[in-house]
């Protein structure tokens, strides 16, 4: 769906027209083989085509420590997605579900995320597989995958806390 598409039977759009609460700085651009939403996969595959993440020059020093083989969580802005749908029918069968209960790219803050391993790094370019976004998608952030990352900073008391949260 593009932002200009009609909604499907059973779907509901918001009429919210307030101002945003926060700003986002794009740190790069993602280059993929997909130019149209109908071509783009619903989920990235580890054996999918190689895509290129271009990190803008300002942010190049922030890539220090990212090497070939690094497993990253890639955050991107799904800039061609609708942002007003509250109820969606992912199967196009009229059976609506709340936007927050599905992984649709159509959401108030269209942030996409994929876990991908760096095949190769060449300066400001990361070549990876496993993305599910359009060519030219803005890059929001890169983080090491939680499963492989051990914090470098000293532990804090909350790191060891277990049990029920206070109410």
Curated annotation (Swiss-Prot):
Q: How does it assemble?
A: Homodimer.
What residues does the TsaA-like domain cover?
24-154
The intrachain disulfides are none
Annotated keywords: S-adenosyl-L-methionine
Tell me the protein's name: S-adenosyl-L-methionine-binding protein RPA0152
**Pfam families according to UniProt:** TrmO_N
The UniProt record lists the keyword Nucleotide-binding: no
For the ligand (S-adenosyl-L-methionine), the binding residues are: 41-43, 79-80, 103, 113, 132-137
- Give the InterPro entries listed for this entry: TrmO-like_N, YaeB-like, YaeB-like_sf, YaeB_N_sf
Q: Region (Disordered): which ranges?
A: 148-167
Q: Which PROSITE patterns match?
A: TSAA_2
Gene3D superfamilies tied to this protein: YaeB-like
Q: Which family does it belong to?
A: Belongs to the tRNA methyltransferase O family.
SUPFAM superfamilies this protein is in? YaeB-like (SSF118196)
Source organism superkingdom: Bacteria
